[in-house]
UniProtKB/Swiss-Prot annotation:
Protein name: Histone H3.2
Native species: Cricetulus longicaudatus
UniProt-annotated stretches for the region Disordered: 1-45
Residue positions where N6,N6,N6-trimethyllysine is found in the record: K5, K10, K28, K37, K57, K80
GO-annotated cellular components: nucleosome; nucleus
PTM-bearing positions, type N6-butyryllysine: K19, K24
Sites of N6-(2-hydroxyisobutyryl)lysine modification: K5, K10, K15, K19, K24, K28, K37, K57, K65, K80, K123
Modification Asymmetric dimethylarginine occurs at: R3, R18
Role, per record: Core component of nucleosome. Nucleosomes wrap and compact DNA into chromatin, limiting DNA accessibility to the cellular machineries which require DNA as a template. Histones thereby play a central role in transcription regulation, DNA repair, DNA replication and chromosomal stability. DNA accessibility is regulated via a complex set of post-translational modifications of histones, also called histone code, and nucleosome remodeling.
């Protein structure tokens, strides 16, 4: 076959690497050589929602037993010294306290949602207690 002369044509954006790609490749290779890999972080709110679902499923007590027991003894000290408690009495107090707090936080969350917010504030707790009739 006979050789023919090539005519010049415009390039249609061939395969030449662009500068942006070169810098991206350099950025990717830099941490592999000497940098420290960042730890994985979940987006804000993801872990919170996971914890909410986990604690709503569970039935175990959320406050540690010994700190709660110390608090009960400290409060009881104001009324009478040298009081003794059965372990079942402390457990009953803890069950009742946690049930009360969970209910209060549910009502507090409803107050915050009513105010078109997702963050609970002290004024929400005050409103919830006032509606319940616990505080004038």
């Amino acid at each position: 076959m006979a050789r023919t002369k090539q005519t010049a044509r415009k390039s249609t954006g061939g395969k030449a690497p662009r500068k942006q790609l070169a810098t991206k490749a350099a950025r990717k290779s830099a941490p592999a050589t000497g940098g420290v890999k960042k730890p994985h972080r979940y987006r804000p709110g993801t872990v919170t929602l996971r914890e909410i679902r986990r604690y709503q499923k569970s039935t175990e007590l959320l406050i540690r037993k010994l700190p709660f027991q110390r608090l009960v003894r400290e409060i009881a000290q104001d009324f009478k010294t040298d009081l003794r408690f059965q372990s079942s009495a402390v457990m009953a107090l803890q069950e009742a306290s946690e049930a009360y707090l969970v209910g209060l936080f549910e009502d507090t969350n409803l107050c915050a949602i009513h105010a078109k917010r997702v963050t609970i504030m002290p004024k929400d707790i005050q409103l919830a207690r006032r509606i319940r009739g616990e505080r004038a």
